[in-house]
Amino acid sequence: EIPLRLVGSEMCIRDSVGMACKDDKGEWVLINGNQTCLLFLYYIIKNRIATGKMQPTDFIVKTIVTTELIKAVADKNKIEMLDCYTGFKWIAREIRLREGKQQYIGGGEESYGFLAEDFVRDKDAVSACSLLAEICAWAKDQGKTLYDILMDIYVEYGFSKETTVNVVKPGKSGADEIKAMMDNFRANPPKEIGGSAVSLTKDYKTLKATDAKGNVTALDMPETSNVLQYFTEDGTKISVRPSGTEPKIKFYIEVKGEMGCPKCYASANAEAEKKVEAVRKSLGI
């Protein structure tokens, strides 16, 4: 009944924000957590450049399972991006380590959490909602919507689709199955996923990264974690980890593609969905 262009909502504890906006056909679409983080960081970077506030010491942070499109935006705009483990204590750690030497300008994760300022050391929906309103006003000044800005990002930096698959294994037998699955991935790492060769494997339990030729380099992380990541030649990223709170193993899938124009979203998304299904078939999930 009310002609809205955007709907946003905080969680009851005010730590995460979700949103929906209208697409180019006037239909409501949900913006996922990866897209939310991407939009926030894209705007922060572009706004700092446009207003002359960008400094060589600026940096942003994302978690290792969050979309790699953020890295593409950071690299093209020559800003340092740091990867950390899931959880905002790790983002807060990066802020603390660089306090007085570098300037944190934003960071987030794929599960709708974002931290826009460094005076809060946890995900904060209050400042995120204020930032969201600012982005919407910025878009409107250009005659665009939030959806249009997202399409602009995909055209400039490439299209990506992210999917999380949860494989539930209840009980003690389930915990044993999850352990066996992780052990099997380590003992028999896939050489190909979804029809594309694996070019890099990261094992955060051993803190080692191994490329397709067997060359091993160290991962610079503060401690070990039971997480595996696979990167393929076509830009796909798969992250695998047992849940720390529930009886399940989580697969974070991100596939890449090209999007030639803002109106090409449907075809780019359809191709990405095919890639996701191919990845799931390869992994047996």
Indicate where each model-derived feature is located.
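Catalytic or ion-translocation cores adjacent to nucleophile or general acid/base/metal-coordination motifs
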Residues: 33-44
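A short, sequence-level motif marking secondary-structure junctions
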Residues: 35-37, 242-246
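A hydrophobic, small-residue-rich beta->alpha segment in the mid-to-C-terminal subdomain
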Residues: 247, 252-262
